[in-house]
Curated annotation (Swiss-Prot):
<protein>
    <recommendedName>
        <fullName>Glutamate-pyruvate aminotransferase AlaA</fullName>
        <ecNumber>2.6.1.2</ecNumber>
    </recommendedName>
</protein>
<dbReference type="GO" id="GO:0008483">
    <property type="term" value="F:transaminase activity"/>
</dbReference>
<feature type="modified residue" description="N6-(pyridoxal phosphate)lysine">
    <location>
        <position position="240"/>
    </location>
</feature>
<feature type="binding site">
    <location>
        <position position="378"/>
    </location>
    <ligand>
        <name>L-alanine</name>
    </ligand>
</feature>
<dbReference type="GO" id="GO:0006974">
    <property type="term" value="P:DNA damage response"/>
</dbReference>
<comment type="pathway">
    <text>Amino-acid biosynthesis; L-alanine biosynthesis.</text>
</comment>
<dbReference type="InterPro" id="IPR015424">
    <property type="entry name" value="PyrdxlP-dep_Trfase"/>
</dbReference>
<dbReference type="InterPro" id="IPR015421">
    <property type="entry name" value="PyrdxlP-dep_Trfase_major"/>
</dbReference>
<keyword id="KW-0028">Amino-acid biosynthesis</keyword>
<dbReference type="GO" id="GO:0006523">
    <property type="term" value="P:alanine biosynthetic process"/>
</dbReference>
<dbReference type="GO" id="GO:0046677">
    <property type="term" value="P:response to antibiotic"/>
</dbReference>
<keyword id="KW-0963">Cytoplasm</keyword>
<dbReference type="GO" id="GO:0030170">
    <property type="term" value="F:pyridoxal phosphate binding"/>
</dbReference>
<dbReference type="GO" id="GO:0005737">
    <property type="term" value="C:cytoplasm"/>
</dbReference>
<dbReference type="InterPro" id="IPR004839">
    <property type="entry name" value="Aminotransferase_I/II_large"/>
</dbReference>
<comment type="subunit">
    <text>Homodimer.</text>
</comment>
<feature type="binding site">
    <location>
        <position position="179"/>
    </location>
    <ligand>
        <name>L-alanine</name>
    </ligand>
</feature>
Length: 405
């Protein structure tokens, strides 16, 4: 019998956050080992519970949420999203401009599939959240990575963006606040990106899932209100700010001129209809989440868990010889730099795997985020301080004797 192979469409699709290193971690756990996980931004396992009022409203609406809804989502949920963004400067957004999906991930894939033809290019940051690159590849497009500059607080390199635009470039992806670096972009930088998009007729895809997870004096500026004359698609959801990643509730909001994008919008509506609708019971969480008390503020200010965990992780990382890190101003991650020459690192996945096998701590290698060099890794700052201290003390011990062959 001939082997059954995966589709050739998946040849360039990669999502190493849940890749071979995670499989090895699962094997270790099955053998009875405890693995400290600093690899994925899933708040619930780290003791971040959802607000009670969200759970109560979902439970209360369960009896009437057993059937399909509109393929774009419940009217009440989309109305709440519309009002949320109108109050933030997107005055012309209507209910029909909003699509609710099974998490932002599903919507990213739909947005790329509806737009890209074979060989079309999409500007994606390096490092990136790798689903963006995977979605572009799955949609027959080509992800062209523009560099973010570590020496400038991980802001995008505007000259590199300009240099990588070609006649095939359809759009640009902006992840702000950024995963994996924790950068929060200034209004001035965003205005410059808008001008580049304007000059080259690019669609802006704005991934803003961490827009309320900000530290110190950081301020988030949504890019869509800065570009009312451009088609901008903003992605957000409940997973991070409201700690309900398992609910799989995300949305995308179309803003700007849409008459010239009728064909693209038809494609989005077709893909939304093909999967019928997003999870209906969990959509009842959206109105409550956006309209109620924003409890995330308790975690991101001094004394709050996210604030204190970020600070402690940053201090400990920078105390490790050969490792340095830009202090994140938002999101749930850090993207430290490791002195590859000092440790002779030429394969960062091997480094992460070696660390896992020796110390039973799970990280993600930097190249998993489409960073071109094997000199970074990502950690999440969700674990409690005790676990962060234990994990990073193990990493310091590991590196003290590490040298790749």
């Amino acid at each position: 019998m001939s082997p059954i192979e995966k589709s050739s469409k998946l040849e360039n699709v990669c999502y190493d956050i849940r890749g071979p290193v995670l499989k090895e971690a699962k094997r270790l756990e099955e053998e009875g080992n405890k693995v400290l996980k600093l690899n994925i931004g899933n708040p619930a396992p780290f003791g971040f519970d959802a607000p009670d009022e969200i759970l109560v409203d979902v439970i209360r609406n369960l009896p009437t949420a057993q059937g399909y809804c509109d393929s774009k989502g419940l009217y009440s949920a989309r109305k709440a999203i519309m009002q949320h963004y109108q109050a933030r400067g997107m005055r012309d957004v209507t209910v029909e401009d909003i699509y609710i999906g099974n998490g932002v991930s599903e919507l990213i894939v739909q947005a790329m599939q509806a737009l890209l033809n074979s060989g079309d290019e999409m500007l994606v940051p390096a490092p990136d959240y790798p689903l963006w690159t995977a979605a572009v590849s799955l949609s027959s497009g080509k992800a062209v990575h523009y560099l973010c500059d570590e020496s400038s607080d991980w802001f995008p390199d505007l000259d590199d963006i300009r240099a990588k635009i070609t006649p095939r470039t359809r759009g640009i992806v902006i992840i702000n606040p950024n995963n994996p670096t924790g950068a929060v972009y200034s209004k001035e930088l965003l205005m410059e990106i808008v001008e580049i998009a304007r000059q080259h007729n690019l669609i802006i895809f704005a991934d803003e899932i961490y827009d309320k997870i900000l530290y110190d004096d950081a301020e988030h500026h949504s890019i869509a209100p800065l570009a009312p004359d451009l088609l901008t698609i903003t992605f957000n959801g409940l997973s991070k700010t409201y700690r309900v990643a398992g609910f799989r509730q995300g949305w995308m909001v179309l803003n700007g001129p849409k008459k010239h994008a009728k064909g693209y919008i038809e494609g989005l509506e077709m893909l939304a209809s093909m999967r019928l609708c997003a999870n209906v019971p969990a959509q009842h969480a959206i109105q409550t989440a956006l309209g109620g008390y924003q409890s995330i503020s308790e975690f991101i200010t001094p004394g709050g868990r996210l604030y204190e965990q970020r600070n402690r992780a940053w201090e400990l990382i920078n105390d490790i010889p050969g490792v340095s890190c830009v202090k994140p101003r938002g999101a749930l991650y850090m993207f430290p730099k490791i002195d590859a020459k000092r440790f002779n690192i030429h394969d960062d996945q091997k480094m992460v795997l070696d660390f896992l096998l020796q110390e039973k701590v799970l990280l993600v290698q930097g190249t998993a985020f489409n960073w071109p060099w094997p000199d970074h890794f990502r950690i999440v700052t969700l674990p409690r301080v005790d676990d962060i201290e234990l994990s990073l003390s193990k990493f310091a011990r590991f590196l003290s004797g590490y040298h790749q062959l």
